[in-house]
Regions:
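Intrinsically disordered, low-complexity regions enriched for glutamine and histidine
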Residues: 2, 60, 76, 104-106
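Compositionally biased, intrinsically disordered/low-complexity regions enriched for serine, proline
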Residues: 39, 46, 50-51, 73, ...
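Fungal secretory targeting signals
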Residues: 56-81
Length: 384
């Protein structure tokens, strides 16, 4: 990646949670100073012309676990997008797992294009007319289950750090690549995780699905595979990393996962092993980040009491976190973005963007007609 792009990264880091990042005049040496928040006084890390700035930033990330800009922490990343999508709708519809069913089994939080409905086939991007995402050519839909507090009040979503002004709740979406990739084709869909995951051992196998108990919006704390066991000062951060190797044939599979293969080993943004012969096509690394604002319920969480939060599918451990994806980029726009080394964060030459006040005008109708907010006596779809 060019010095100019790493200079852009430095701009994002300046002043973020006690971090100062500067380039030398020649753009070949990145110096990052960490504040005393690490407990040992200021620390300065320097990348020489012979070392990789991404490697340096990965070190910082593992020391501090405090940046939402994780895209920049992988070495090497040749192109990538990071952008926000405001919330589109919250209702019991799932066109991937339960196509045609209205309602579906549990409530989902959905962002993206307005073609979203109970039945979605073919080229979604060709049917949508607007999107809640900053990338104006992205009419995909992204969704996850939705958590509630223990007495079934829906937990609100709040903005992640370093998103476009006006982003309302929603998700942070990443598309990254470390080598030449093939963009998802029209009609493609997949899921990651499962609401039936019920044990710690099962959850640990989903390496790309993790939580963080936010100390501040930029200080995440350690990753965990289940819900935090104590109140989080700034909310609960959930991340979903999808597999990035495709069989090259099927747009979907009966379990919505077998047509993909996961090469994530440790860090969710790193796909080091090559794709296997059974799934030879490397696709973009897709990631969702969501910040659940659990802070309004912290005073209702007695000291020493179990975690009160429950996913909309009735999961209280957090093990069953999962996410769905329906590809809907217009034409070859995603392929162009992944081909361009200057694509970084939300800036990418010919890829069109929109202001979030325009994105926030995009809506879909309530297709189920049930109450999902306020103090409920039971989870929607789970009434006895």
């Amino acid at each position: 990646m060019s010095p100019q792009l790493w200079g852009l990264l430095a701009k994002y880091l300046i002043g973020e949670d006690g971090v100062n990042a500067t380039w030398d005049a020649g753009g070949t040496r990145l110096e990052v100073t960490l504040s005393t928040s690490l407990g040992s006084g200021p620390i300065t890390l320097v990348s020489s012309p012979f070392s990789s700035p991404p490697s340096l930033l990965a070190l910082i990330y593992h020391r501090m676990k405090s940046f939402s800009v994780a895209l920049a922490l992988i070495a090497p990343v040749h192109a990538g997008l990071r952008f926000g999508c405001s919330s589109l709708t919250i209702q019991r519809i799932d066109p991937v797992v339960e196509p045609g069913h209205n309602p579906s089994a549990h409530v989902h939080h959905i962002v993206g294009g307005n073609a979203f409905n109970a039945t979605m086939t073919g080229d979604v991007g060709a049917r949508a007319t607007c999107t809640t995402c900053e990338m104006a050519e992205d009419f995909s839909n992204y969704w996850t289950a939705h958590p509630t507090n223990g007495s079934y009040h829906r937990v609100p979503v709040k903005n992640n750090a370093a998103l476009a002004a006006g982003t309302t709740g929603g998700m942070t979406i990443y598309y990254t690549q470390q080598q030449y990739i093939t963009a998802f084709p029209p009609g493609f869909r997949m899921t990651v995780g499962s609401p039936t995951t019920s044990t710690l051992d099962q959850a640990r196998k989903h390496i790309g699905l993790r939580y963080n108990c936010l100390q501040t919006l930029l200080n995440r704390g350690p990753e965990m595979v289940d819900f935090p066991t104590k109140p989080c000062p700034a909310g609960i951060f959930a991340v979903h990393h999808f597999p990035a190797c495709w069989d090259g044939k099927n747009l979907d599979s009966p379990d919505h996962q077998s047509h993909m293969y996961n090469t994530i080993q440790y860090d969710g943004f790193t796909n080091a092993p090559p794709c296997p012969a059974s799934h030879p096509v490397r696709m973009p690394q897709l990631t969702y980040e969501t910040v659940w604002d659990t802070t309004k319920f912290n005073s209702m969480w007695p000291s020493g009491a179990p975690n009160p939060f429950v996913w909309s599918f009735q999961g209280s451990s957090g093990y069953g976190t999962h996410a769905d994806y329906m590809f809907g980029w217009k034409g070859d726009s995603l392929q162009r973005a992944m081909n361009k080394s200057e694509c970084f964060y939300d800036g990418c030459g010919s890829i069109k963007k929109q202001t979030m006040n325009i994105a926030n005008q995009c809506t879909v109708k309530d297709m189920v007609g049930e109450q999902t907010d306020g103090w409920l006596t039971a989870l929607p779809g789970m009434q006895m």
